[in-house]
Amino acid sequence: NSAEPGSYLLTAEEEALIKTVCSAFKRTAVVLNVGNIIDMKWVDRYQPQAVLYVWQGGQEGGHAAADILTGAVNPCGKLSDTIAADISDYPSTDHFGDAVCNVYAEDIYVGYRYFETFAKEKSKLSLRLWSVLYGFFRGGFEYKNGRYESRTYRFS
C-alpha cells in the first residue's frame, strides 16, 4: 500500500463520485470492496451516514453485504485492521514495496498490537470514525431458552 491514488488514496474519480452521491442524497452508504485499508479522511469531508468495508468477501460477499445494507443482519463486529488517521501512522509504511526483500521491522507489533503498545494517541485520532467504521449496533436483543446441543448453541 502506498500513498498514491488507486492504492491507499482514492482516485479523483472515486472521490468525485462519493462527493456527488453524498451531496445529492440525505442518506448515503459507501461500500468499500477493497483488499486493504484505505485513507478515510474523505469521511469527514463528505459525511456519509454509513461506511461498510466488505473486504474480500468471496463468493457470498455480495449476499452478505446486501443482508447488512437491507437490515436483514446486524453488522456488529470487530475490525480486522486498525484504521489509522494517516498512512504514515503505520510503521510498515517505511519498509513497504521492496521488490527484493520484505523487511518486517515491526516484529510482533503489527496492527492493533503496535497501536495499543506504542501509539495509542495515533489510534485515538481515528476514534471519531469508529461510530461509522466499527459496526456499532444501536438496537437490542436478548436470548431466551438457550440450551447446549452438541458443539453449538441453539436459541429460540
Residue ranges, per PLM feature:
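C-terminal non-catalytic regions of proteins with extracellular/luminal or membrane-system context
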Residues: 1-156
